[in-house]
Amino acid sequence: VSRHRQHTQHGRRSAARTVRRRRMLIAAVAAGALVAASGVALGIWATSDGDGTSEGATAASSADRTGGSDEAAGTAGRSPSPSPTRSYPLSRAPRTIPAVREHTAERGPGWRPARSHRVVVADPVLADEGRLIAGELGLAYAGEKDDRRAGDLRLELNRDSGANPESYTMTVRGGRVTVSAPGEAGVFYGTRTLKQEIRGAGSAPEGVVRDEPAKQRRGFMLDMARKHFSAGWIEDRIRELGDLKFNEIGLHFSDDQGFRIESDSHPEIVSPDHLTKAQVKKIVDLAESRHITVVPEIDSPGHLGAVIAAHPDLQLRNANGGAVRGAIDISKPESARIVDDLLNEFAGLFPGGQWHLGGDEYQALVVSDPEASFPGLAAAAREKYGLGATVEDLTTGWLNDRAATVRAHDRTPRAWNDGFFRDTSVKADEDIRVAYWTGKEIGARQPAEYLSEGREVVNYNDEFLYYVLGEPLTFVYPTGQRIYEQWNPRVLRGTTAVSERYDEQILGGSLAVWCDLPRSQTEKQVAAGIRMPLRATVQKLWDPDRPELSWSEFRALAGRLD
């Protein structure tokens, strides 16, 4: 869509629109007085999952009392306007997080929820989306209906196979709202926009929103291995993420400090503080209802301390017999067997199409001469891949084998960027996506190296997107302002963006919470600390261009929408 046709959140006006506004000045002032007289104030915002009968009815009740419906617009205790028609100024674009990408302004009263209004769906597969928004706005969920009534909120699929499956169109016109999309996710995102409009302004402006995300992977990652997080806290984050149009939550649940989910295949490795499978299933179900994919991560061959604690015979040892913390001996078949047991088991618990294999910081590779320091690994590499094979080759083969395990469950694998090596005879499989997090390590490869190989990349840039509890080493807590003003998905390493020609290979990004010093913050403090970084991150993933709102305006908007 050409830029001159867009009406964005910043309220940019064309010269023609300004002229029209001047010509309608007198009528607009009169109309403004009428609108002000019938303004809505929503006192309580629904926070339940919504089934059409929740406490969200308070919102509709408030709208009823303040003239929310068309029928009530001319009442509220005073005589009707003597004018037979009402003139409205052109509507302003809604203000939401993330910002809608296009709004076509129209003249009209907009739409407010009222107790008499219905939510109807044109397709039964949209029942979950319909019930949720009905409960949140205090409307009646009427199910699948063909008739049209005043005040209806209608959800429908348009079956446009060529469109972005997460795109949607929301039309506010004639006292009704229609959300139309090629897929269920797009319909859901349209309802999130509507919910924010009502929350922030009391009404949805007349006109048409056409919206879609720029990036397909919009994520948040949680290190729940180093610090145990309650199921309720994770569920609250999923609701927050859904309202912000995120579509991934990564759960890093295995590391040196703990293994945090119940296991049937290897119960001996599970930490005392952990989530049951029933709790995880509830989390996964809630995420699915918000169109969020849960991306599990069992990191290997490093960061396996909790597994090794129960299986010390699998711990990697150097040439002097010294144990290497967190590193499993990948020359032993038993090591592959136990990790594959876990990957196969948890593939049944996490049905989403993505899987994180880790692959970072294998301690056998941080020494100057891995072959001399770990002769057992060097011998295994030569035996498997031939003379001249290295420990890096053996480690790459391990990554490929684990990728094959999850690929058998129709999962797309990803791994941390320091698990991919240059100049090896064994190459990482082409479909393993690169989770780029750091370039600070000696010899770290530039992002362009992966991209020039044709690899797809997800941005976890630790310069902007790492929230590390206790701020160890050189880490500092990220700020929403810095992300909002300085970062975009092409800024993969440090503060420099890669070439625009790689844009399509960069699938998106993820804000990551790491719990290196787990007692540094409580759950409540973590939630507060990531609040604005989450909002800034999703804004730049939805639309990487420079935002129309200043940071202070964006922060104020976030306060109104919470």
Each model region followed by its residue ranges:
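Active-site beta-loop-alpha junctions enriched in small/polar residues
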Residues: 225, 254-258, 297-303, 360-362, ...
